[in-house]
């Protein structure tokens, strides 16, 4: 069990201390994350305008929406690896610079094929989340990991919400062009990437960080963990098969084309497995010092936790407005208002989850409390029916949303403590599983009633609680002034790797 070495932890008012280097770094980083999410979600608010201007059908736009998330899951892992190898500053700038081009390409595309390809490439911009987590972990002490990560992720996630609010206004009122509205968002992101390159460092000036030895795959500590890592890696690419199945069933692509995509998915899985073996066999043959070992099940607990928090959040956001409209006979506007509660609460409750994690006696106990709240919250939501008072239904949804989004905060409060030099890798795995969870939940929803859907998520959260209760370890030094470094970290920092 970890004990505190200093009770002076970061609080809400510290966010206004702009003279402190770490606070300035936090604000610069959440803004970078914010812009990547603004660009990632810059199509959805303009769907009706795009259809009217281009003559595309709603089904064609739905395929574009699937392309918009298709590569996010596997690229989050790849970008996490890159973070650990070259640092989050360079990685963030690479993401912002490179993703600006498919954004602008999509804006001025002259054919549907161009729109498909550009949107597919642009789905990788969703990796900005992983880079922000890695950068924040370098600037803040272990005792402040939860709150700082929660603030960065909470504010950054608002990029999608602000895109929904501002882009229609910009496209229809200010610019009179959906193409320029989307293109300018990419240009702004590119410009901010250039600013970010000069405005920040990987942690406080003068500090050194241990780098991962290889960028191709996550490092493990035992042969058993290598098998575990392979099993946990397969779904990250394999989940894309569900997206292919969806577009095939809706006749968006032919069966013959789907076979090609399935073959590419299998090839991607095999590549990831071979990369894990190639990176880790030499390390394991040489032997891993005891102070450098970690259990891969620790990564697994965070992956499953993010499935039932962020994955559930994305899945529920997609159906909640219609749920309110159907159950309580609300207008689309009112249903949308109540259905947006998950997104609106994101900053406050996610930061609150991290804040609670920083202040409890153990981070594991804080996390388990939130997981129990997620399970209980969705069970209560499954009981909502037309006989309920609307106010009570809204209260239940708000409570559930507080636990779900707060659970995102307690999950990433644990990420930096798995193994210091692979924080980006761990964030990539957890982030990828969050998106994969959303794909699985939304696919399952097509076979379930609303109540069954909520019960399924609640049951999955309950199983995750049990999994974490038995297999999650309280990290050493979770409230310390500095992160613990292993003998291998020290050797790498000295240039001996």
Locations of regions flagged by a protein language model:
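Central cavity-lining transmembrane alpha-helices of secondary-active solute carriers
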Residues: 63-80, 340-353
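Glycine-rich segments within core transmembrane alpha-helices of 12-TM secondary carriers
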Residues: 146-168, 428-441
